Amino acid sequence: AASIARDLGLPRSTAYHLLSVLQARGYVTHYVEERRFGLGQAAYELGSAYQRQAPFARLARGTMRRLVDQCGRNAHFATLDGRDVIYLLEERAPGQPMLVTDVGVRLPGHLTASGLAMLAGLPASQVRALYPDRSSFTQRHERGPQSLGELRGILTRTRTDGYAREDGTVTPELSSIAVAITDRTGRSPAAIAVTFRSREATDEHVTALVAHTRAAAHDVARRLRPSSVKNPGH
C-alpha cells in the first residue's frame, strides 16, 4: 500500500481505502503473510474475458477503420459478458468528443446501444435470468430502462428496427446507434456502434449512420463464416 500511495501520489489512507474496495470486489487479494497485495480472481476473469475476444477484435479492425472514414464519427466494437458489455476496439475520428468506451472498459449492457443490440438477440428467458429484479438495472445519469418490462419494450423495438439506439444514457449530450453481428448459428456475439452528438440526430443523419454501421456489421459477420482455404500447391 505504501508503494502504491507513493507511485500515485496519494495519501496512504486513500490508498488503503481504494485497496479495501478493490479487495471487496475481488479485484485485489491481500497476502497477509507477505504484507503485499496482488491481483484478485475478478481481475484475472476480466483479463481472460478480454483475451478470449482479442482475435475477434483483430478481425474487425479494418472494417471499423473504414466505417470511421465513411461516417466521420467514433466507432466501437463490443461483446456481451453477462449484463455488461466489454469494449474490445475503438476507432476515433478527428474532431469528435472523447468517449468512456476505451478498450477493456465495462459498462452496463442495458444502457449502451451495443448491449441493447446484443440483448435483443437473446431468448426472453435468458434476458429474464440476467435481469431478475430492479436492482439489476444500474443507472448512470438516471436514464435508461429500470424494469424488465421497460427493457423488453426497448428490445422489441430494437428487433423491429434492426438496430439499437441510446440517447444520453452513457454520456450526456451524446447518442449512439449499434447493429449486432450475427454469426451462422443466429447468435449475436458482438456489436458495432457509432457515437455522435445528440444535437446532430436528425432522421436523415441517423438513417445514414445506421446504413454504414449495418454494412460494417454484415462485413464482419461474413468474415466469421468458415471458408475453405485453397492449397496454393494444388
Please state what every model-predicted region is.
Residues A1-R58, H218-P226:
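N-terminal helix-turn-helix
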Residues D7, R58-Q70, R157, D161, ...:
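Amphipathic alpha-helical regulatory segments at dimerization interfaces
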Residues V28-H30, F77-A78, I181:
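A structural signal for short hydrophobic beta-strand segments in well-ordered beta-sheet cores
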Residues E33-E34, G38-R134:
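Amphipathic alpha-helical effector-binding/dimerization core
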Residues P108, L116-G121, Q126-L130, T138, ...:
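Regulatory sensory and allosteric helical modules in signal-transduction proteins
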Residues G109-T112, T207-P226:
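Short, solvent-exposed cationic patches
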Residues Q126-H141, A217-H234:
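Cysteine/selenocysteine-centered motifs that mediate thiol-based redox chemistry or coordinate metal-sulfur cofactors
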Residues R143-A217, H234:
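Extended hydrophobic
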